[in-house]
Amino acid sequence: MAASPVLADSSFYIRSLRARRDPLKELALAAATRDVAVCGVVRCEVGRALRDKGMLARFHKAWDVMMNVPTDNRLWEETERTLWELDRRGRIISLTDAVIGCCAKRIGAVVLTHDSDFALIPGVRAVNRLDI
């Protein structure tokens, strides 16, 4: 059975960069055994944090060859439903985490993250490291 795709959350990229590790190299290792995905929210959150234009261009080059999860009307409806259901149970998460989680669910991906909110989203598997 093939390994599930992985969608790295912004917290993975940012924590790796702060620790002076290259998140793109880590994801390239994962890509040897599974698909690596990105969504628009992650691109925007991470891209805005990159100060160096050369580094931003390098990230764009990597993201452009990853599986892109589109955010169409169905995804927004699923995100709204997820947030509504979580709110009713007293579980409040950010809109951006809900979108990323719904993107991961859409493609059957595991979320690579350091954010505990993803564990609250039904149907989302979240890990803080990959066993490569």
Please give the residue ranges for each predicted region.
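Generic structural signal for small/hydrophobic residues in well-ordered secondary structure
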Residues: 9-10, 46, 79, 104
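Active-site neighborhoods of divalent-metal-dependent phosphate/nucleic-acid chemistry enzymes
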Residues: 68-112
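Short, well-structured N-terminal submotif of metal-dependent ribonuclease cores
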Residues: 1-38, 48-61, 132
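A general structural signal for well-ordered alpha-helical segments in protein cores
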Residues: 24, 43, 56-59, 76-79, ...
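A generic structural signal for short hydrophobic patches within well-formed alpha-helices
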Residues: 13-14, 43-46, 118-119
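Generic preference for hydrophobic
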Residues: 38, 68, 126-129
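A secondary-structure boundary/capping signal
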Residues: 9-10, 42, 114
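Acidic, PIN/NYN-like endoribonuclease modules and their adjacent C-terminal/linker elements
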Residues: 1-5, 26, 101-132
